[in-house]
């Protein structure tokens, strides 16, 4: 299956998940009180960390390896299952201590219930990896959509019946249970019970998986350090403003890069020895991501003040100033976040781990320096740290696929030129539009957005041959 087909089905699944998230926000928030949501948020701190270490990078190893036998898959299955059981037992044993730390007695029962998702999801991680390895993303999308929709309907029903936080707990359990059953049904592979572990096979993937697990842990802590430092040294209102800006920045970027990297990984892994195919596929992927991200984030930065005030209210004004720096940061991160896929496909998770350590040192230094001044300076330093981190990461990435930074910059330069022209046009028309509509009205915001989007679209048709060919050929999204 091609990258386009992979991305198409991953995107459909992701859109449904986002829709389910919106239902959670809009409808469940009306039925479940904030205090109950808070309990689930506490539980998710533990659950998300558990999910991070659940498979120790072994599922990625199944996808990455050019040739893999059933013995290694079987060993990975049993290792994951025991890891899932181990994490669940740890959560059960430590739930009173976790509850005491958060000063929330109800958290004990929530953690006891939700811990079941670890053995459930672990028992199907090998099956999911095999489906992804074979690019069966249409089947995966069908499974994830079905599980998401059924899960949210059950949550709505339970919330209506005043189950409170347990509506969210059961939504999570139902999603994992249904996904597990369907992944088992979709994959023909079955575990063997006579010899659970082939230690020679596990030894083969140990280096790949260990480095990937360490990178994931480093990345998890470095990405959450900013909120911890701001919360420790600045006012809670400042942390709130920063968190909102960060979520606004991250929401579209996370969705785009998740779709791209999940669809890209099996394709790159199969072509890991064909450097020309690898380079072309990766550069095309980066081009597609930046084609959307550059105008989106540039426009958001330019219109941050009216956008924030109109959508969130005047009390969030500080968020608009932070967005001026986090929006361009998102452009850099949208490229950096794809780099892990290439290093994984090439089996060089050792380089990925070292880059993770470098990134953590840069980000932590930026956070520690920035917090001494103001939240705006904090955001500026974060932006500069991303720029510094970009060059060694992309230099090493292009090097292992027999390319160079010049090829990367040459590929994406037209997009940045188009984005710059779009901002210049928006700057020129801003005053005339402001004379027609007040800056803090939806009429002004929508008009400016339309002008920016139209400018960018026209430039894309004129300057970019692939976009022109795509439109002229009228390639459907779903074929």
Locate each region found by the language model.
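Alpha-helical transmembrane segments of multi-pass membrane transport and lipid-handling proteins
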Residues: 78-103, 109-112, 153-157, 161, ...
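Signature of the first transmembrane helix
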Residues: 2-58, 82-95, 112, 117, ...
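Hydrophobic alpha-helical transmembrane segments
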Residues: 108-115, 143-189, 204-208, 244, ...
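N-terminal membrane topogenesis motif
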Residues: 1-22, 60-63, 67-75, 107-108, ...
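Interhelical loop/hinge segments that connect adjacent transmembrane helices in multipass membrane
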Residues: 3, 138, 181-224, 228, ...
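Helix-loop junctions and terminal segments of transmembrane helices
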Residues: 51-70, 132-133, 245, 249-293, ...
């Amino acid at each position: 299956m091609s990258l386009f087909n992979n991305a198409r089905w991953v995107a459909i699944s992701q859109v449904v998940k986002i829709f389910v998230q919106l239902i959670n926000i809009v409808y469940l928030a009306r039925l479940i009180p904030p205090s109950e949501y808070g309990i689930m948020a506490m539980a998710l701190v533990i659950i998300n960390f558990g999910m991070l270490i659940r498979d120790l990078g072994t599922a990625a190893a199944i996808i990455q390896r050019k040739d893999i036998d059933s013995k290694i898959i079987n060993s990975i299955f049993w290792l994951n299952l025991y890891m899932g059981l181990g994490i669940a037992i740890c959560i059960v044993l430590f739930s009173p201590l976790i509850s005491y730390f958060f000063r929330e007695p109800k958290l004990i029962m929530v953690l006891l219930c939700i811990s079941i998702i670890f053995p459930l999801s672990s028992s199907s991680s090998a099956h999911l990896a095999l489906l992804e390895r074979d690019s069966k993303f249409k089947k995966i999308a069908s499974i994830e959509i079905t599980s998401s929709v059924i899960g949210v309907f059950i949550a709505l029903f339970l919330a209506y019946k005043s189950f409170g936080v347990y509506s969210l707990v059961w939504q999570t359990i139902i999603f994992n249970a249904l996904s597990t059953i369907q992944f088992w049904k979709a994959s023909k592979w079955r575990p063997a019970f006579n010899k659970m572990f082939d230690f020679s096979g596990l030894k083969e993937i140990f280096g790949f998986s260990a480095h990937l697990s360490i990178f994931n842990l480093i990345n998890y802590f470095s990405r959450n350090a900013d909120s911890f430092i701001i919360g420790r040294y600045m006012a809670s209102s400042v942390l709130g403003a920063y968190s909102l800006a960060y979520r606004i920045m991250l929401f579209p970027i996370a969705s785009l890069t998740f779709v791209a990297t999940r669809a890209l990984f099996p394709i790159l892994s199969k072509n890991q020895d064909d450097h020309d195919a690898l380079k072309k596929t990766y550069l095309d992927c980066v081009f597609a991501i930046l084609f959307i991200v550059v105008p989106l984030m540039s426009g958001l930065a330019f219109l941050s003040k009216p956008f924030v005030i109109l959508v969130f209210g005047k009390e969030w004004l500080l968020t608009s100033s932070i967005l001026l720096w986090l929006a361009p940061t998102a452009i850099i991160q949208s490229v950096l976040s794809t780099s892990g896929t290439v290093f994984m496909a090439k089996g060089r998770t050792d380089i990925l781990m070292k880059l993770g350590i470098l990134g953590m040192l840069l980000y932590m230094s930026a956070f520690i320096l920035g917090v001494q001044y103001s939240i705006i300076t904090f955001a500026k330093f974060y932006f500069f740290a991303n720029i510094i981190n970009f060059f060694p990461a992309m230099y090493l990435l292009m090097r292992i696929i027999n390319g160079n930074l010049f090829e990367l910059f040459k590929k994406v330069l037209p997009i940045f030129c188009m984005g710059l022209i779009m901002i210049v046009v928006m700057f020129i028309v801003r005053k005339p539009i402001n004379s027609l509509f007040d800056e803090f009205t939806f009429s002004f915001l929508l008009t400016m957005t339309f002008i920016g989007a139209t400018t960018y679209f026209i430039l894309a048709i004129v300057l970019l041959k692939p976009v022109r060919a795509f439109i002229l050929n009228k390639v459907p999204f779903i074929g």
